[in-house]
Swiss-Prot record:
Protein name in UniProt: Epithelial splicing regulatory protein 1
Modified residues (Phosphoserine): 542
InterPro entries, per database record: ESRP, Nucleotide-bd_a/b_plait_sf, RBD_domain_sf, RNaseH-like_sf, RNaseH_sf, RRM_dom
Tissue-by-tissue expression: Epithelial cell-specific. Epithelial-specific expression in diverse tissues and organs with particularly notable levels of expression in skin and gastrointestinal epithelia.
Modified residues annotated as Omega-N-methylarginine in this record: 581
GO MF, one example: mRNA binding
Knockout mutant characteristics: Homozygous knockout mice die soon after birth due to complications from cleft-lip and palate defects. Knockout embryos show alterations in inner ear morphogenesis and auditory hair cell differentiation.
Domain spans labelled RRM: 224-301, 325-405, 444-524
Major localization class: nucleus
Amino acid sequence: MTASPDYLVVLFGITAGATGAKLGSDEKELILLLWKVVDLANKKVGQLHEVLVRPDQLELTEDCKEETKIDAENLSSAPQLDQALRQFNQSVSNELNIGVGTSFCLCTDGQLHIRQILHPEASKKNVLLPECFYSFFDLRKEFKKCCPGSPDIDKLDVAAMTESLNFEKSDSVSRYGASQVEDMGNIILAMISEPYNHRFSDPERVNYKFESGTCKMELIDDSTVVRARGLPWQSSDQDIARFFKGLNIAKGGAALCLNAQGRRNGEALVRFVSEEHRDLALQRHKHHMGTRYIEVYKATGEDFLKIAGGTSNEVAQFLSKENQVIVRMRGLPFTATAEEVVAFFGQHCPITGGKEGILFVTYPDGRPTGDAFVLFACEEYAQNALRKHKELLGKRYIELFRSTAAEVQQVLNRFSSAPLIPLPTPPIIPVLPQQFVPPTNVRDCIRLRGLPYAATIEDILDFLGEFSTDIRTHGVHMVLNHQGRPSGDAFIQMKSTDRAFMAAQKYHKKTMKDRYVEVFQCSAEEMNFVLMGGTLNRNGLSPPPCKLPCLSPPSYTFPAPTAVIPTEAAIYQPSLLLNPRALQPSTAYYPAGTQLFMNYTAYYPSPPGSPNSLGYFPTAANLSSVPPQPGTVVRMQGLAYNTGVKEILNFFQGYQYATEDGLVHTNDQARTLPKEWVCI
């Protein structure tokens, strides 16, 4: 609770575009600023002041011209934004005769005038706003506190407030903007008088700057997160904060997303302090950052934690010094040392803390990845460092990029939590032989490319028309990207090569929801490669990460056991057993033994009906096995992530279970819950 100001300055802004609830959503510039001073102590209202503002683009919408009676000729000789703000500041200072102990605060009709007009436009034009624009009273919220029985805030405009107070509409001022300021002054006088006696004591705040920091695995409200898409590759968290200037982003709440190769994919997740600020951020959909327009969509707290959460001790220690500028180095020699990095930047851009300000990225086995993060104390040092982009360190040129705390976490988490590829040992979990595996050279599948992201399986069936009856059971496979979202691709398994060929010929480049879709004939092998994370292009097949050569490939094989289905398993439904889905090579799970590390980037999350790519090795089509000891496999779902072997065995206390070697941890990327397999 802060002290009530001596004066309120009622402020109202008009842009060259939309008005009312859509004010500022069309990115139009400010053209008129109106204000009036209210003396709270003496309960007096001052004179109306206004100043025209010349925008960079002298184009006004027809609605704006009709409401404001302003045209381009009036604006051609008007002052620009910085000059208009100086006039405003000078006028208020002269009228209030501000001295020691005198205070005033702005008061607006809602949040839009300050958060969606003045701050974003001033940021784009590099105009420094006066101190008074970083705190203001929202008259709608104050009126709701004063009159709890009034309409909801989203419906509470100036007209609704005057109606609630039973004011007679004044005909003395009829111009748009001027009439609103006149009514707001009268509303304030009524609120501070009997019987309300309202005190203006808790103003809204606008953050001066974005605070970087780490994000812990805490509960995040889904209604506070947005996804920004289409960002320039070199953009940083500070650029994102500047795009959302005027809205309060939570500390460390701007997280840049990385693709499967660890490079930025042009997306970011942004967490705001409240749902109100998130909703205002959504109104900036397709606003511009430089020459690029940025798409803004709703996201979830889970999405944000996947990108920015899970800070390790190493990362937390590195980022413990706040307000540091982070630069990412890429392409370092694997033998590079901290001393060489310090010498690379030199005296003109000293690293914060010397060697302590450098964080090398390594694989889980300690091998360097060629990446590192460096801290600089100020923007000037960081800019000097970025000028060394593509300079040589040893015999390799080094790429330098502005980075963020969230990117440090992502990169470290990505490499430190890479999946471990176990050496093949005799399988212990029965895998039933599949009923049918198509020859890899039979082109009885089709690939759909360029699907709308919102396309469903039903949309695909409608798109294929008569050929939808020729699709095999569970034969539609949607390809997801590394974030679990549709990639625009899908594979369809047809009943014959002829029908696949005819479908590809007939529907190639036909439209689905205003987008033309490319249809190609392909084989089951090509489909499996893509669904497991590989790429299919004109140059042929690029294998998925799990198909890449291991660092130390095993040099031995195991005898194939006889394919037998245990009688104990016959009482269970097929869905409860590890039965591979149709049209997928037979697979077998292996226990965790001696581990190898794979150069891991990311996998496509497998959609239902698609082959999974984690936790097992492809084996020969006729290979299947049973546990070496009699028993039955029981599947457990919904386990907590920190559940260990001891907790599972305690759960089965009283039953005779196999040794701990008979318990296999699996991690299904297509699921959000862990599961365990126990041999009893």
